């Protein structure tokens, strides 16, 4: 295939090993790579934007090596993609990749994910976009995950990637030889037992640290074809999970189940 112009971002920041591995994988396949990502970790920022302070960017080419132009940005992942598309890139990219995230982005976690938000920003701008994650916070080998991501992206681009489709890719944290087949998956329902650690600062004021414990739920598969596995169960079985996502959050349940709301409070007589 002809070389693609690829924009890469993430939420783990410009110094993360995952984004460097992804950029190198794309470059090795002959693609033209540019990186615009946060200048420090911005995990779990969701689709937040910076409105109360200016965005600053600094060149970071030296972190990625020859042939890759890179910037570190003071904003969120969504800021980075917006700024790249509006100001930093000379031309609209053919593809946006976000990752490789150091940890999973499964199920309803995607609503908090800066990784997914960066890809979603691309989708909103009608650029084919994919979020990539290795489903472990401790896994350090991202090279094979980068190869998988580029392979999938190339296939999707060659098969008329729909403009409204965001691909959410999760790769199991195991050796290449132990990874099993790829499957389309449904978003699971990820639930947490939220825990706050209450502490006291030197001035005697209370502050809190959030620490959530995942409640494992392999049965809840969310919306989608009933014969598709959930993304969580796919990863549990050392299989690659690929979930189609779109910006449309319209409720897909039975319309008869909607609450009955009348208009009596509007301009009451």
From Swiss-Prot:
Its EC number is 3.1.3.5. It is an enzyme of class 3 (hydrolase). GO terms for molecular function: 3'-nucleotidase activity; 5'-nucleotidase activity; exopolyphosphatase activity; metal ion binding; nucleotide binding. SUPFAM superfamilies: SurE-like. A divalent metal cation binds at residues 11-12, 43, 101. It comes from the Bacteria. Belongs to the SurE nucleotidase family. Nucleotidase that shows phosphatase activity on nucleoside 5'-monophosphates. This is 5'-nucleotidase SurE.
